[in-house]
């Protein structure tokens, strides 16, 4: 292997956001029930049961502090319908050039969300991507920190702060493409450690998910049962300013709670 490309990506790693060395995970340290952990240890920052009507299709039409980031791209198309206490999302992804993206203020280092949701079965590839954002973070694309992504077949947990959304990583990929260089296999292997995929078959029933970050770990539970946990430095970011979710087609949200533990 030519030493110079490897040296270049090692130097690139030095430009990624500095974080303390990851502590070893204590044996059996994670709570067995993250819903109970949030409720017992956390402060409820926000709750919405969507018992109202939307006021229009614009940025703030959902009300109660929510913002629909893609609404103003297609003001004549309704992407959110508040119906009988349910936020029914129907993303106009093709028309907007982006999946429906809805967010609300959060504000914690450790904490998380409890969300009651349902895939209504109106489209084949319904998915739900939810996680945390810090738009004040300038070295990560749009401040995207970390996400859980529910598809019809699996659950993905991903650290985007030190992974795919890091601007230094994006620059390396762009530079490699411009120079017609093959991706460095060691660098790509490092990036793969930022993501974990767990098989999880979707259905059309109502479920309650819990997504938390605690230090270097992000955990996902469904109906009170742990499904997946992943450790990566980006999860330890000290300010998750927004709770954010995206949908590529249709998903229904019945209840959202945001908790701060630290």
Question: Predicted segments — roles?
Answer:
Residues 25-65:
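Extracellular carbohydrate-recognition regions
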Residues 35-36, 99-106, 194-201, 242-243:
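Beta-strand-rich interaction surfaces with strong enrichment in secreted/lumenal proteins
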């Amino acid at each position: 292997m030519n030493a110079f490309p490897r040296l270049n990506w090692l130097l690139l790693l030095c430009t990624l956001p500095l974080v303390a060395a990851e502590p070893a995970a204590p044996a059996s340290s994670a709570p067995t029930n993250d819903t109970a952990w949030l409720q017992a240890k956390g402060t409820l920052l926000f709750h919405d049961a969507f018992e109202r009507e939307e006021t229009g299709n614009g940025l703030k039409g959902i009300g109660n502090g929510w913002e629909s980031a893609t609404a103003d791209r297609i003001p004549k198309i309704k992407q959110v319908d508040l119906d009988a206490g349910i936020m029914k999302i129907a993303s106009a992804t093709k028309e907007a050039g982006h999946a429906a993206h809805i967010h609300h203020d959060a504000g914690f280092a450790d904490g998380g969300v409890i969300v009651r949701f349902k895939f209504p079965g109106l489209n084949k590839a319904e998915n739900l991507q939810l996680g945390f954002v810090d738009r004040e973070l300038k070295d990560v694309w749009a401040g995207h920190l970390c996400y859980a992504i529910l598809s019809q077949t699996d659950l993905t947990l991903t650290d985007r702060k030190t992974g795919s959304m890091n601007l230094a990583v994006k620059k390396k990929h762009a530079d490699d493409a411009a120079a017609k260089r093959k991706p460095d296999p060691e660098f790509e292997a490092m990036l793969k450690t930022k993501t974990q995929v767990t098989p999880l078959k979707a259905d059309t029933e109502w479920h309650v998910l819990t997504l938390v970050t605690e230090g270097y770990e992000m955990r996902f539970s469904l109906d009170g049962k742990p499904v997946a946990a992943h450790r990566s430095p980006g999860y330890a970011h000290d300010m998750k300013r927004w709770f954010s979710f995206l949908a590529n087609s249709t998903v229904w949200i019945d209840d959202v709670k945001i908790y701060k533990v630290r």
